[in-house]
Amino acid sequence: LFLSAYTIHNMILKENKNLLNLLYEKFHFDKRGEFKDGESPTVFEPIFEYKEGRLRFRYLRNYIDAGHDVQNQPLSKSQKEALALLDNLTRDENIILRYDLKPGDMVFSDNHWILHGRTGFEDHDDENLKRQMLRTWVKDRT
């Protein structure tokens, strides 16, 4: 499953600019226990931002809910409304690209603006036939 953050951004812009503006404000994202002593258990970042002229998108609703709980900073009614709109758009079948990967297929995507996911699958019992996936990050040095 693939979905463009630009598409979501522009749909929210058309539907409710005030809610889009809220998504440019910072939210607490839970670090899921991956922090050192003395560090914050959350990252405080916006969902949408433009960085170096490019749209960047970060969103995991459960990380935001947990992050605000950890920081004891409840989400406002308008923040919840903005996140609900975002949740609905990320499930909109009209804007999701579905692609059935075949053995040997390779996918490259930019995690800063392409949302990605997968549907459920049943794996083989035979170790030689089990699903294999190699995930790597390629850094753009420009």
Language model region names:
Residues 1-103, 108-142:
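Active-site environment of non-heme Fe oxygenases that use a 2-His-1-carboxylate facial triad
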